């Protein structure tokens, strides 16, 4: 493990960030509201890329391009935050890097969060983004990518698409970093709990508590919107998973693998020990740079 990765892991331990994810629901909601005061929709003002913001189902979607005209291919890229915490400007350098190094436009939806919306509303917005992208770029030219809960949405697009009466073409590639998942069977819960002591970022308790928040009072929520490994990924070109081998969400991997096998979709897995949650999307240290480069190689094919 590199020195920077070791320091980052120590910083997470000392910060007490994990403890916040173990708070009871009321206290957790207050903490989320506090964090969201400094997060949310942003409009880039730099000249490092070409930016456009469109409205989709009443919510903004930022489009990042390397050139004034649309590229031939695009990535639908999702921020993480447990479906409850909004993005910040720290996501922008990663978007520009993806855009520049893959040759793809990057679409970044500011999707509705489950503090105020049911997860089904989130899916309605991001799926409409996907529909617009298929119309513009054509089938086979759109991939999805995301980290944490954004990884769940990147996978969920495919499952949601297969649940439609008239599905669109599936994503060319799906790349996910530490995808979120509400555990849905006893074995998965045991696996996640066993990893909890080794995870310095996310507490297992959050993966249980967040289900109620995601439902937002709605009972008829499809299983795949809460637990992505229950979805049908049939038709996807390929799926690529990146994890820390020492995080709670790594416990869900066997069930995602089973879902890929059921759907006959090729998949790969990369799991590095001692990394923090979603480390790949902070490509400023050795391990993250190496794995981000792998992500770029996948998405530019």
Residue spans for each PLM region:
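Alpha/beta-hydrolase superfamily serine-hydrolase fold, recognizing
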Residues: 18, 52, 56-62, 68-301
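A glycine/proline-hinged amphipathic helix-loop "lid/cap" segment
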Residues: 1-67, 236
């Amino acid at each position: 493990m590199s020195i920077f990765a070791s320091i980052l892991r120590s910083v997470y331990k000392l910060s007490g960030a994990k403890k916040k994810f173990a708070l009871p629901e009321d206290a957790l909601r207050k903490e989320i509201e506090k964090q969201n005061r400094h997060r949310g929709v942003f409009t880039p003002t730099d000249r490092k890329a070409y930016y456009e913001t469109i409205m989709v189902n009443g919510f903004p979607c930022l489009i990042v391009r390397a050139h004034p005209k649309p590229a031939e291919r695009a990535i639908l890229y999702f921020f993480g935050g447990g479906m409850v915490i909004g993005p910040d400007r720290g996501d922008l350098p990663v978007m520009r890097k993806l855009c520049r190094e893959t040759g793809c436009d990057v679409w970044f939806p500011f999707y509705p969060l489950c503090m105020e919306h049911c997860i089904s509303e989130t899916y309605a917005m991001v799926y409409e983004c996907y529909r617009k992208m298929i119309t513009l770029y054509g089938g086979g030219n759109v991939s999805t990518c995301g980290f944490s809960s954004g990884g769940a949405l990147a996978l969920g697009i495919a499952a949601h698409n297969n649940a439609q009466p008239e599905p669109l073409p599936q994503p060319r590639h799906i790349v996910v970093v530490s995808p979120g998942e509400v555990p849905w069977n006893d074995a998965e819960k045991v696996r996640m709990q066993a990893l909890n002591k080794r995870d310095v970022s996310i507490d297992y308790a959050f993966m249980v508590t967040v289900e109620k928040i995601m439902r937002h009072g709605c009972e008829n929520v499809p299983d795949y919107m809460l637990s992505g490994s229950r979805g049908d990924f049939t038709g996807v070109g390929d799926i690529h998973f990146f994890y820390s081998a020492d995080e709670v969400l790594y416990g869900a991997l066997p069930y995602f693998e089973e879902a890929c096998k059921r759907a006959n979709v090729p998949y790969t897995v990369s799991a590095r020990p001692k990394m923090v949650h979603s480390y790949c999307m902070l490509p400023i240290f050795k391990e993250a740079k190496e794995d981000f480069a792998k992500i770029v190689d996948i998405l530019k094919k």
